[in-house]
């Protein structure tokens, strides 16, 4: 069976491959130079992926990702919005898929993503948090987030929610990163964290919330949880 394809921050690609390479192929991200440097290599700032082999990509990195991902059978769609350096111009592609819904701050969202979702009948919910994808880990019908607006919208949609403390996640160049940016689905029943969950004050609660839903956890011992712009699956070998 074909393994999943992931895009991961090029600055951490070797560490990510060492930690999670057994789960699939890890492709280094293409830096998007219109974004601020700390997030310029974050996949979730320039890509929207449905994990079923369609990726909507920001114009500045479209050709680079076409070369990187086309050999794996990934379909690339060029977006219309070039992400800016500052918030909220930088979050056009930052859309969270969770439990069959899509969550984002839709004003300023990439129109190709909106069109993609509407054609598939996926219900969109507005949240105040522009970094929707970064701010939440979604798996099955469950969401883990520190953001109140995402937690509220997800709960109102019937999803199971664990709300955690903000912070406690490294993102060099900023005060802190987000739980979604430090994690991702690795296979049909495994959630990965780039760092050690034991170092997070809610680590035990996070692990229990995940395992109670029949998923296992794969983290990186002794490493601080680090926001790498999501362990972004762009093509899966299973139904998501």
Please place each PLM-identified region on the residue numbering.
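Histidine/cysteine-enriched polar flanking segments
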Residues: 1-240
């Amino acid at each position: 069976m074909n393994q999943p394809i992931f895009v991961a921050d090029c600055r951490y690609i070797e560490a990510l491959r060492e930690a999670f390479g057994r789960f699939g192929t890890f492709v280094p991200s293409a830096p998007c130079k219109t974004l601020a440097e700390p997030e310029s290599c974050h996949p979730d700032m320039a890509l929207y992926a449905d994990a079923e082999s369609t990726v909507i990509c920001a114009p500045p990195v479209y050709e680079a990702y076409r070369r990187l991902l086309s050999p794996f059978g990934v379909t690339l769609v060029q977006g219309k919005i070039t992400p800016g350096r500052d918030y909220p111009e930088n979050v056009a592609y930052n859309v969270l898929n969770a439990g069959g819904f899509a969550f984002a701050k839709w004003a300023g969202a990439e129109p190709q993503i909106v069109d993609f979702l509407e054609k598939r009948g996926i219900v969109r919910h507005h949240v105040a948090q522009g970094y929707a994808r970064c701010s939440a880990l979604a798996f099955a019908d469950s969401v883990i987030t520190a953001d109140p607006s995402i937690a509220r919208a997800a709960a109102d949609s019937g999803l199971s929610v664990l709300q955690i403390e903000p912070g406690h996640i490294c993102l060099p160049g900023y005060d802190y990163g987000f739980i979604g940016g430090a994690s991702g689905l690795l296979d049909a029943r495994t959630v990965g964290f780039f760092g050690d969950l034991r170092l997070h004050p809610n680590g035990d609660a996070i692990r229990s919330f995940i395992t109670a839903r029949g998923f296992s956890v794969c983290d990186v011992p002794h490493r601080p949880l680090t926001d790498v712009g999501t362990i972004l699956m762009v093509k899966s070998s299973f139904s998501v």
